[in-house]
Design a protein with these regions (language model features):
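Membrane-embedded segments
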Residues: 51, 55-145
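Short N-terminal helix-initiation segments at or just after the protein's N-terminus
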Residues: 12-14, 42-50
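Hydrophobic membrane-insertion alpha-helices, especially the h-region
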Residues: 4-25
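A broad, low-specificity signal for short, low-complexity segments enriched in glycine/proline
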Residues: 7-14, 33-38, 62-68
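Acidic/glycine-enriched edge-of-secondary-structure segments
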Residues: 19-28, 72-80
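Alpha-helical transmembrane signal-anchor/signal-peptide segments
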Residues: 26-46
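Secreted/periplasmic serine-hydrolase-like ester/acetyl group-modifying domain
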Residues: 119-188
Length: 188
């Protein structure tokens, strides 16, 4: 009897987990995955990674480097990112590829905050990386700042839980879902 009850509970937990995983996948915004799909699809290593804020994001063009110099590069820069945020994006990217060179934007060294004022930008940078020990460390470090736990205008509470599991953030997107949301994510 105990074995049957244990197996029933285990099956219920597995079904609940699968349902939550599917709902999370369906309701989350796919912009992070779309933006960084090529990074995960690239088979060979990159020559150069660029990390930083809007300056390298808007001023460095990997395709130009490829066409003009044969340099394979990837631009991880994100608008509004202070150095701690792009440090962790760099660490997460290094779990997948090993470039010969890292170019780091030093513009924001004078900022005190560990994350951007617009928390949605953190989702664009972090959501595309699968859950890992490095991602957990990154989220814990970036949110280890009292000013980052406040609720901001966009309404999302700044919590590690919301960056590690996106369903609580995007669960109300039902009326915004499109055909694109039902298609598989290429790099996940």
């Amino acid at each position: 009897m105990k074995t049957k009850r244990f197996l029933s509970c285990l099956a219920a937990l597995c079904l609940t987990g699968a349902l939550l995983w599917g709902l999370t996948w369906l309701t989350q915004k796919k912009d992070s995955y779309a933006k960084h799909a090529e990074f995960f699809e690239q088979r060979a290593d990159y020559d150069v990674f660029f990390v930083g804020s809007s300056r390298p994001m808007n001023g460095i063009f990997p395709m130009e480097l490829w066409e003009n110099y044969g340099i394979v590069s990837y631009n991880w820069a994100q608008a509004g990112h202070p150095p701690p945020a792009y440090y962790w994006v760099m660490r997460l990217a290094l779990d997948y590829k090993q470039p010969k060179l890292m170019v780091i934007d030093c513009y924001g060294m004078h900022f005190d905050a560990k994350t951007t004022g617009v928390f949605g930008l953190m989702h664009i940078s972090m959501d595309n990386f699968p859950l890992s020990l490095t991602k957990i460390r990154a989220v814990r470090d970036m949110l280890d700042d009292p000013s980052m736990t406040e609720e901001y205008n966009e309404g999302e509470r700044r919590s590690a839980f919301n960056l590690l599991w996106t369903f609580p953030v995007f669960h109300s997107r039902w009326n915004q879902l499109t055909q694109e949301d039902y298609r598989p994510i290429r790099n996940y």
